[in-house]
Structure formats: structure tokens, C-alpha cells
Amino acid sequence: MPLVTSKEMFEKAYNGGYAIGAFNVNNMEIIQGITEAAAELKAPLILQVSKGARAYANRTYLKKLVEAAVIETGLPIVLHLDHGDSFELCKSCIEDGFTSVMIDASSKPFAENIALTRQVVEYARDHGVVVEAELGTLAGIEDEVNVSAEDSSYTRPEEVEEFVSKTGCDSLAIAIGTSHGAYKFKPGTKPQLRFDVLEEVSRRLPGFPIVLHGSSSVPQDLVAKVNQYGGNMPGAIGVPEDQLRKAASLSVCKINIDSDLRLAMTASIREHFALHPADFDPRQYLKPARQAIKELVTHKIVDVLGCDGKAF
């Protein structure tokens, strides 16, 4: 099976009340852990690559690793550009064989966001590629994305119809209170997503797939393990999983997860070196790290996304 677009995936997810996991990848072990979990659960999958990951892992290596995952698992897999910040980057990824790209012009004025998104959509259409766009701006730091809380903003539902109509985008990322990175909410506050915004967007765009970025839950057992074995992550808090599950049961068809993968891998490696300080063969610590990724993704697919058994 070749790489696929997310169009059919999202139609099924919207009608079925579940979401597809979009997991950020940047090396072999992360890709293997994610795809092994998805294969066992027969779950559809989006593997997404940021600008930073593409630079780190080399565009050719990363593409071939994803292609190997398709061959090995036989799963429907989307290769997606996460947070493309220019037409040129989106064009390059499309030419490299990506089946989905995101153009993130959410920090620009509304009219400029529309114009740049439309430019990407027109090019992508000619190549059979789908486009995700964004309205509203998430706070937080992750890879190339760095937005202060002061510069973040919720999506304005009254803008979504005009935006989708004028751009022709295939899915829309909205801001309802999630944020990038591992420090999403202040300690002592109750994390709460703006479901009123989501519901109003859904009312205005019936049947249209919505995307949530910054949706890692930052499991506290992983944070504790990182800190236990020499880390320093005080106050790391994520999005409650019950709220993500609720979003998946509504119009959210794609939920992005990155920080949780980083936590799982880092916690495993820190623990391994604390318990086995003499080890120096990378396979000795990367194998359990890969297993930690697999276990995390298994949990996400079954208990948060609800997309197990939905691959075919």
C-alpha cells in the first residue's frame, strides 16, 4: 500500500466519532514504536514531520523510514508536514512525496493567512495533496514554533466559514486552549478546553474535519520518572485525556501528539542509564525506549483517540 492522503480517513473519523493520531517523528526508533503499536491495533496513522525534524534527520532518510513503515505494516499512513511556515517549504515537501501539508500562517493578519493558504492549496491540488490550515494561535514552544501567551489567541468562529471558503483547505486547526510543549497550564489551575468554541466552529462547518495541535497529555508518571532520574521538569502539565476523548467524539478528526513521545523516550533512557551505568551500546537503551513509545501510542489509540480497528 502506498502513502495515502487523510481525506478518506477524516470522513470515516468524523462519521465514526473518533480521531486519528498525528504523531511527530524524527528518528527510526520513534517511527518503529508508533507503527508497531498501530499495526497491532489496526489503526490508521498520520506520521508528521516538522521543519526541524526534516533538517535534523535529513529529508531523504526520514522519507525512506516512513516508506519502510508502510511496507512493514501495510497500514494506511499519511506523511504530513507539520507547521509549514512558507509556500517554499510546503512545495518542497509535496515534491518529496508528502501526501499532506500544513501551512501555518495563523500569526499573520486574516487576509494574508487566506492568501498564503490559498497559494499552497492551489499547488497541492495539482499534485493530489491535501492541505491543513490554521486559524487562531497556540501558545508554547515546540521545534520551530515559539509563541508567547500574550501573542496567542482563540479561534474566532465567525471567521471560519469565510476562511475555508476562500482558501479551499481540507482541514482546519483551531485554538481552543491547547498549547505546544510540556507546560500547557499553570500549576494549580484546572485545565479546561473551550468546547463552546469547538461546538460553534462545528455548527458553522458541518462535516468539516477539525484539528487540535498541542494535544499531549504530559503523563505525570513519565514526568516523575524523568525527574527521579536526574531531570528537571517542575510544573509540566498537559491536556486531560478525557477532554481529548470528548473532542475526538465531536468534530476533531486529527489530534497532534509530540511532547508525550519525547517524554516516554527520555524517561526510558534516563532510567536505563541510572540502572545500567556501564552500558554504552545504543541498542541497549534505544530498544526499551522504542518499547516505551509503543506502549504510549497503544494507550493513546485505544483510550484517547478511539481509532483502533479503523484502518481498513
Residue ranges and their predicted role:
Residues 228-231, 239-312:
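C-terminal alpha-helical cap/extension of soluble enzyme domains
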Residues 5-21, 279-280:
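Generic N-terminal amphipathic, Lys/Arg-enriched alpha-helix
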Residues 212-218:
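Long, repeat-rich segments with strong aromatic
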Residues 1-3, 312:
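Basic/polar N-terminal segments that are highly enriched at the extreme N-terminus
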Residues 4-12, 27-53, 59-76, 84-209, ...:
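Alpha/beta enzyme core
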